[in-house]
Curated annotation (Swiss-Prot):
This is ATP-dependent helicase/nuclease subunit A. CDD domains: DEXQc_UvrD. ATP binds at residues 30-37. Keywords: ATP-binding, DNA damage, DNA repair, DNA-binding, Exonuclease, Helicase, Hydrolase, Isomerase, Nuclease, Nucleotide-binding. InterPro entries: AddA, DNA_helicase_UvrD-like_C, DNA_helicase_UvrD/REP, P-loop_NTPase, PDDEXK-like_dom_sf, PDDEXK_AddAB-type, Restrct_endonuc-II-like, UvrD-like_ATP-bd. Residues 9-474 form the UvrD-like helicase ATP-binding domain. GO terms for molecular function: 3'-5' DNA helicase activity; 3'-5' exonuclease activity; ATP binding; ATP hydrolysis activity; double-stranded DNA binding. It catalyses: Couples ATP hydrolysis with the unwinding of duplex DNA by translocating in the 3'-5' direction; ATP + H2O = ADP + phosphate + H(+).
């Protein structure tokens, strides 16, 4: 029983009902800004306070973890407040304890807890972990590799047909992409295999094909009838004209055709497919114009109606009936086995992927849902015993953002709720008009089905409550939004009727100052009048709107009833995507306005990130021209376009630019300076390649950053803080990647490529807080749930993305899979019945979701809403005004063929302000007759860019004469003096800039060796090219023998951890020790065969091992960084102030004396007659400089004499001479 609402409460009647109604399933349709979160919290509190329900017996499901934390905090706060008011209430005391066990979480979190408690039902290891994003992406890719490999081995005829249709000559990327899409679609269903198995049914069953034909017929009929009306208008106008017999003859022919085509309830598809238009409509010549003087506009209008008719019929012919019905149905039969085989491949992927995850003991988010469902259901799909216990435990289940659930989540909820809809305990809150996550497999039809089934009385099934009062926005925003959607959204296009229950009602305590919505149409300047593109012009125009807000607008404080000046943080720019972000950033920078792109996209497009990725791709495989040349052209290596052209010209027919570099370097006519530059570049590449063989990706990135001062350089540019954060972000992602079960540069690059392909960005690293005074740009998706005083909704002229509609395979969650028919023999593809039908359905659903995105964008605004669209000329605006009207809405065909949001928005809002529009193209004759809730309050402004632009066109490439330059500088002696001082300045520490600030001991060794030979070391370094040919890429190499330097690193790793004890290690114990290194992942398992066991045993059996084992203290792999001045005994006035860094293999202390040991895996040639002493002297001489630095460094640090040994595994111990 709902309690009587007191007069002094803040809740509306609908909110009050939402808080207290119970006894059946309840769906609360909460419009934007209607206070649904407050209602949800209050309902939880009242269930605790009024009904004595324990908080841990409520299951509250939110959409995000952040929402869950905020919800839990609010509930906890309210419980504490109630407890303070009634300190003796034991029930409230218990709630303060139980709140910590309360199930207020995302559904994924609930599923995870369920699995942790009932893992025994699933027969899985309880110590499972959640896979990282990188791990999951790469493992799925690997699984698809394996499954396709199996099918390539079988070469089933249907598989061959699929590969012929879905793969290109170069790769099978499209085929793989379709498999992945099908995988994600299928697992969004409670029974993925069942969903996949039914995909082929429409291709086999005639009754299903008839249903598809009827669906196509119904859609095509809409366009044909609209075409008939356009043709009739054309006929009526031409009938009033003189000398238009030819035009009327054509129109009469078309009238006969379309009358025959649309007679009856079913279209005559044969007539449509066979119909051919005249190649050209008879021209409106000067004779006709003279005969109809003063009626030129009517002539043009008549022709426009005919053109519109033709375009509508052509759409039907091309999109729906390009082939006759018999051909469409015959192709379905031939496609059936092909579709069934594709479904089988996806089933194989699901099974194999599951096995791969189990072998690694990992779960992903889809596993959470499906494993939870296995726990909660029996084999027949009925609720399990465990589900019954949860039903008994939870008094109520509350679901937030219900419009964003999918079929799997719906099934989980149905298992743990009690009763049927008329007596259940499920409370759902959401707004289907804000369902904008179809790309995540959210299914708004679940909400719509319940919305239509439930009633406001709740007598027949569940109870439906509409929360429509908006407490966020001014009246002008709400009424204009209502007017727009009442004429744009219905069940046909939009999937829900925007009726009185769905519309927004004003509820915020604003003053009565008018703030009309601004609908701004920017007419582009031509290329003759502006150097800027249309997008750049729009960005500048938006800046002007921001300036106007800051200079002239105020923000109303509803609590105090006072105004304050608008600030930058009050303003948000909303767009469909981040495509315009770069232009906006530049425009705001040019005007010194603080601006931040709140981006979850665009990370990989950042200059600094692209540089690092080009570097990584080049290191992995320099035979990729785009990345190799990109790296060469970058700020790091600074090759000019002229130099690159010079390299290419020498051997223009090389397959790869890397080959051109090699050929250029040996060309007799090559520029020696360019060859030197190339040598340094190649040396760098090979150095990093060698490093990447033994080090993880994040260390390779870190080395690149340090070697080339990448962080420092980008930090000094505009936006340096964000750039630095982006670089560190990539490094951190590489660290995360290494923590997965995948390793190596190739796999990391593959992970990045997958993220890019999926348009799943890391997001630019956010360096701006919520209170920073900046103008923000964000996508509509990321703005959901937020509000701003001023919203500039721009980019309205950007076309809807209908690219997926052109794919050879169309997927729909409800209907299944539509595949084009591909004739293998003719190598030609044709639309099939299924692909035509599902393409039309998806187009309709796409427009519906775009409408919902418009709704979300408009309802973010509190004070004022500014809509910005862009057109080439004003003729487009007239065309939008004239969109056909059907009853109270824009005609269905106009909505389905709309190319962008601006067509719809301007087409609705401009009609009532157009003085010349005929009544049949209006919604009403007088908007003043409308009630306040739907009366549009909109100011339409048409601006030509030339009229509003402050752009100053400056050509920096202008060639000026000496005389002009002299004239500019005449009489400006002070400037001349300052310029001379700047240009002639001599840096006092120039020598130091020629030397690195930090050098390794190995680098110093090479430098001193060359300088002692009277050779410049920098010159020598240019020619350290290494191997002449490039190895095969890693992914093409089956087995690979380790190089000498890799074996050296491996031996050092073994020695680093080698235990020293007086009872020497046996050979078996050494093998056990190496196995432990493998278990700890310190070395790879396949490395075991490359470890020189006998050489290590020789060391263990030798005297040096025993001396170390008996030492007082032993330190291994000791790093050091020391000032070279101190090591070399220089004075502080000496020019070279470099820092030396290095790593000493082992140091031990015996009786107060320190010794260091450096292991060497060098091979050497014993010439005939050479004694051991001669070989020893040769080896000591080779490492004399390095050992001297080691000893001097240790003596500098320890302040005492130090002795040292070189240990050669192939020779033995050598003591370092004093």
């Amino acid at each position: 029983m709902i309690p009587t609402k007191p007069h002094d409460v803040i809740w509306t009647d609908a909110q009050w009902q939402s808080i207290y109604a119970k006894g059946q399933d309840i769906l609360v349709a909460a419009a934007a800004g209607s206070g649904k979160t407050a209602v949800l919290v209050e309902r939880i509190i009242q269930r605790i306070l009024r009904d004595d329900v324990d908080v841990d017996r409520l299951l509250v499901v939110t959409f995000t973890n952040l929402s869950a934390r905020e919800m839990k905090h609010r509930v906890d706060k309210r419980i504490q407040e109630a407890s303070f008011k009634d300190p003796n209430n034991e029930h409230l005391k218990n709630q303060r304890i139980k709140i910590h066990q309360a199930q207020i979480s995302t559904l994924h979190s609930f599923c995870l807890k369920l699995i942790q408690q009932h893992y025994d039902v699933l027969d899985i290891d309880p110590h499972f972990r959640t896979s990282s994003e990188a791990e999951n992406i790469l493992l799925l890719e690997q699984t698809i590799d394996d499954v396709l490999e199996q099918h390539y081995d079988k070469l089933d005829p249907h598989f061959i047909e699929l590969t012929e249709q879905l793969s290109s000559d170069r790769n099978d990327d499209q085929f793989r992409s379709i498999i992945k899409q099908l995988y994600f679609f299928s697992i969004a269903n409670p029974q993925p295999f069942e969903w996949l198995n039914q995909l082929a049914q429409p291709y086999k069953e005639e009754n299903k094909q008839q249903q598809l034909m009827q669906l196509i017929n119904d859609l095509a009929m809409i366009f044909m009838k609209a075409g008939y009306e356009e043709l009739q208008k054309s006929y009526d106008l031409f009938s009033m004209m003189e000398s238009v017999d030819k035009q009327l003859e054509v129109i009469e022919t078309e009238r006969m055709f379309i009358t025959k085509a649309i007679e009856g309830k079913v279209l005559n598809t044969d007539v449509i497919t066979q119909h051919e238009f005249m190649s050209r409509f008879p021209a409106i010549n000067s004779k006709i114009k003279e005969a109809n003087e003063g009626m030129e506009d009517a002539l043009n209008e008549a022709k426009q109606h005919y053109d519109k008719y033709k375009s509508l019929v052509m759409k039907v012919k091309n999109d729906y009936f390009s082939r006759n019905a018999e051909d469409l149905q015959r192709d379905m039969q031939q496609l059936a086995p092909r579709v069934a085989y594709l479904a089988q491949i996806v089933q194989d992927v699901i099974q194999s992927f599951g096995v791969q995850k189990r072998s690694r003991n990992i779960l992903d988010f889809s596993d959470y849902e499906h494993f939870a469902l296995r726990i909660l259901t029996n084999e027949d799909g009925s609720p399990s015993r465990i589900a019954e216990t949860y039903r008994e435990h939870f008094k109520e289940i509350l679901v937030d953002e219900y419009q964003d659930t999918n079929r799997v989540q719906e099934k989980i909820l149905s298992c743990i709720k009690t009763g049927e809809e008329h007596d259940g305990n499920l409370f759902m809150v959401g707004d289907v008009k804000q369902s904008i996550y179809k790309f995540r497999q959210a299914d708004p039809s679940l909400f719509i089905e319940k919305y239509n089934r439930f009633s406001s009385s709740g007598n027949e099934s569940g109870l439906r409550i509409d929360l429509s009062q908006n407490f966020r926005s001014r009246q002008e925003v709400l009424s204009t939004t209502n007017y727009l959607f009442k004429h744009m959204m219905d069940e046909q296009v939009g999937e829900i009727s925007y009726d009185d229950a769905a519309q927004l009602y004003f509820g915020a305590p604003y003053d009565e100052v008018s703030h009309p919505v601004q609908l701004r149409a920017l007419v582009e300047a031509s290329s003759e009048n502006s150097d800027l593109t249309g997008s750049e012009q729009e960005a500048n125009y938006i800046v002007e709107q921001v300036k106007d807000i800051i200079n002239h607008q105020n923000v109303y404080d509803m609590k105090t009833g006072q105004y304050r000046k608008a600030t930058y943080k009050d303003i948000v720019i909303l767009e469909r995507s981040f495509g315009q972000a770069r232009n906006l950033q530049q425009a705001f920078k040019n005007n010194d306005i603080p601006f931040h792109v709140n981006s979850k996209e665009g990370y990989f497009e950042q200059t600094e990130v692209r540089l690092v990725l080009s570097f990584l791709r080049t290191i992995d495989n320099p035979l990729q021209d785009i990345y190799l040349v990109g790296l060469m052209r970058s700020v790091i290596y600074q090759f000019t376009e002229e130099e690159l052209a010079e390299i290419r010209v020498v051997s223009p027919h090389d397959d790869y630019f890397y080959q051109s570099i090699k050929n250029y370097m040996i060309d007799e006519k090559a520029d020696s300076r360019l060859v030197d530059k190339l040598n340094r570049f190649i040396q760098d590449i090979q150095k990093y390649q060698n490093y990447s063989q033994s080090q993880p990706v994040y260390q390779l990135i870190d080395k690149f950053y340090n070697d080339h001062f990448v962080i420092q350089y980008f930090s000094g540019l505009i936006g340096g803080k964000g750039r630095r954060a982006n670089l560190y972000g990539l490094f951190n992602k590489a660290v995360e990647f290494e923590n997965s079960s995948f390793r190596g540069l190739f796999q990391f690059i593959r992970f990045i490529d997958e993220l890019i392909d999926r348009k799943k960005d890391f997001g630019e690293e956010n360096v701006v807080g919520p209170n920073d005074n900046v103008v923000r740009m964000m996508t509509i998706h990321s703005s959901k749930g937020l509000e701003f005083p001023f919203v500039i909704y721009s980019g309205l002229s950007k076309k809807f993305n209908k690219g997926d509609l052109n794919a050879p395979v169309i997927l729909n969650q409800q209907y299944g899979l539509g595949m084009d028919y591909f004739d293998v023999n003719k190598d030609m593809a044709f639309p099939s019945l299924a692909s035509v039908a599902y393409r039309a359905i998806n187009e309709k659903e796409l427009i519906s979701e775009e409408m919902r995105l418009i709704y979300v964008a408009l309802t973010r605004a509190k004070e004022q809403l500014i809509l910005v669209g862009r057109v080439k000329d004003e003729k487009s605006l007239i065309k939008y005004e004239q969109l056909a009207v059907s009853d109270t809405h824009i005609a269905v065909n106009e909505r389905l063929t709309a190319t962008n949001p601006f067509v719809l928005i301007y087409g609705v809002l401009a009609k009532h302000q157009s003085p010349s529009l005929p009544n049949d193209q209006r919604f009403e004759r007088d908007i003043d007759q409308l009630n306040s809730e739907v009366k549009p309050r909109v100011s339409i402004v048409i601006d030509h860019y030339e009229d509003v632009s402050t752009e100053e066109v400056v050509n920096d490439n202008e060639i000026r004469t000496i005389e002009e330059l002299k004239a500019i500088n005449t009489g400006n002696e002070d400037v001349k003096i300052k310029i001379h001082q700047q240009l002639s300045y001599d840096y006092p520490f120039k020598v130091n800039t020629m030397k690195p600030s930090k050098q390794s001991v190995s680098e110093l060794k090479r430098q001193l060796e060359t300088e002692e030979s009277n050779t410049n070391y920098d010159r020598v370094r240019q020619y350290r090219i290494g191997v002449a040919s490039y190895e095969r890429p890693k992914f093409l190499t089956q087995t690979k023998k380790r190089k000498a330097n890799e074996i050296g690193t491996l031996m050092h790793t073994v020695m680093q951890h080698l235990p020293f004890r007086e009872q020497r290690l046996t050979k078996d114990e050494l093998f056990q020790y190496i196995d432990r290194l493998i278990d700890k992942q310190l070395i790879d398992e396949d490395a075991k065969e490359d470890i020189r066991i006998d050489e290590i045993m020789h060391f263990i059996d030798g005297p040096l091992y025993m001396e170390i084992a008996q030492a007082d203290n032993v330190y291994t792999e000791l790093p050091f960084v020391v000032n070279q001045i101190k090591v070399d005994g220089l004075t502080s006035e000496d020019e070279d102030v470099s820092i030396i860094q290095g790593m000493i293999d082992l140091i031990y202390e015996s009786d107060g004396q320190f010794y260091f040991v450096d292991y060497k895996t060098d091979a050497f040639n014993r010439r005939k007659g050479m004694s051991d002493e001669e070989i020893g002297n040769q080896l000591k001489e080779k490492y004399q400089i390095q050992m001297t630095y080691y000893r001097n460094t240790l003596e500098t640090i320890l302040k005492r004499p130090v002795k040292g040994y070189l240990y050669f595994f192939k020779f033995g111990t050598l003591e370092i001479d004093d």
